[in-house]
């Protein structure tokens, strides 16, 4: 093959080494037991499909490597070969509801910074001792902000919906509520009518990446009536995590291809910066920025690139006077729960190294990413302070 994908991650070098060392020097010569080495190293970033492989549809070979790997993960999960650790780490609602509480969150956060505890966690649970883990909040975003105030004089754009409903996401709800609170400030500042869902569950991306498709279906069906109501009423549905947006815009409609409600929901899902830029084109976005941001090294997450909407975040940040944005369009290497695991931590840091170097070379005042987890990972790699894009606005 062309091997254009070899530099993207460690799955492809593993695959090509197995092929080159086989008796036939083709895939048919690789021991099928070794297939799992490739499957486990794929974290479903979709970059090979989007940017490298020349054989994707409509080519007659119809190569879709990410979804092929996902099927492998689904087989492994169905056979009961997935680890307890992976099942627990992908249960983001359970983890959040258990740990994002007063006192408990403080104990967990303190423990996660304790070397003795992290050594124990590494040796028993295989969560790498050197991985910086996100803190859990003492309160949830939804619990504090569910009763959002109504807008007295809401705007009426013509190109995008005038009303917004926020899909909170597990990370914003349990780990960094400040991201959601900053976005609410933006909505209020710009007189955008908005609501929070009365209830929601995880989008299902962590379970999808594990191959637990039954759990993905259960989560999707719980979210369906909630999101369908707002989609049918013409709301823009906005998620503050690119992976969650991608799940609803791409993966769920593919999994449930006959469900028209999921297709309608996908049509109403917006990236936050894409939505705000649309308002700006109608001169409905406040540009009353009080501070310049100087130089920003901005990392474009894989799951945002896959959405093919362009560099909306960069465009919007550059509306701020005195702000220059340098984009980094490479995988950061963290990739959900994958980079947390002991066996993949070194690969995670290796994949991220070009991103770390590129971020530093710009001599930035800020290092930023739409993906909060990627942002933390890059900060760990370059040891710089970082702020999320939403905070900047």
Question: What are these language model-derived features?
Answer:
Residues 6-41, 55-85, 390-393:
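Non-heme iron-sulfur electron-transfer modules
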Residues 8, 51, 247-248:
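Residues that scaffold the ATP/ADP-binding catalytic core of kinase and kinase-like folds
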């Amino acid at each position: 093959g062309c091997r254009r994908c070899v530099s993207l991650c460690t799955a492809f070098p593993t695959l090509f080494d197995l092929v080159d060392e086989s008796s036939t020097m083709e895939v048919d010569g690789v021991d099928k037991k070794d297939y799992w080495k490739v499957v486990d190293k794929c974290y479903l970033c979709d970059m090979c499909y989007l940017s490298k492989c020349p054989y994707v549809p409509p080519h007659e070979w119809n190569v879709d490597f990410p979804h092929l790997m996902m099927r492998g993960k689904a087989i492994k999960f169905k056979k009961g070969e997935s680890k307890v650790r992976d099942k627990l780490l992908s249960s983001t609602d359970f983890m959040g509801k258990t740990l994002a509480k007063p006192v408990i969150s403080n104990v967990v956060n303190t423990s996660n910074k304790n070397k003795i505890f992290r050594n124990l966690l590494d040796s028993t649970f295989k969560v790498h001792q050197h991985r910086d883990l996100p803190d859990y909040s003492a309160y949830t975003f939804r619990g504090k902000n569910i009763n959002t105030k109504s807008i007295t004089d809401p705007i009426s754009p013509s190109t995008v919906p005038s009303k917004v409903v926020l899909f909170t996401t597990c990370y914003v709800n349990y780990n960094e509520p400040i991201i959601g609170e900053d976005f609410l400030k933006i909505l209020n500042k710009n007189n955008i009518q908005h609501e929070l869902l009365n209830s929601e569950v995880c989008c299902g991306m962590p379970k999808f990446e594990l191959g637990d498709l039954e759990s993905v279906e259960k989560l999707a069906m719980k979210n369906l009536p909630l999101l369908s109501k707002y989609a049918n009423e013409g709301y823009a549905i906005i998620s503050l995590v690119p992976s969650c947006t991608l799940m609803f815009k791409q993966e769920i409609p593919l999994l449930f291809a006959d469900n028209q409600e999921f297709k309608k929901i996908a049509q109403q899902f917006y990236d936050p910066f894409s939505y705000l830029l649309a308002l700006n084109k109608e001169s409905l976005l406040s540009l009353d920025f009080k501070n310049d941001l100087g130089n920003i090294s901005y990392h474009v997450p894989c799951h945002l690139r896959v959405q093919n909407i362009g560099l909306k975040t960069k465009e919007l940040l550059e509306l701020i006077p005195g702000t220059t944005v340098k984009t980094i369009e490479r995988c950061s290497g963290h990739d959900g729960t994958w980079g947390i695991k002991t066996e993949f931590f070194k690969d995670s840091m290796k994949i991220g190294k070009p991103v770390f170097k590129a971020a530093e070379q710009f001599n930035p005042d800020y290092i930023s990413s739409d993906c909060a987890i990627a942002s933390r990972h890059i900060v760990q790699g370059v040891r710089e302070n970082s702020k999320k894009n939403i905070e900047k606005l």
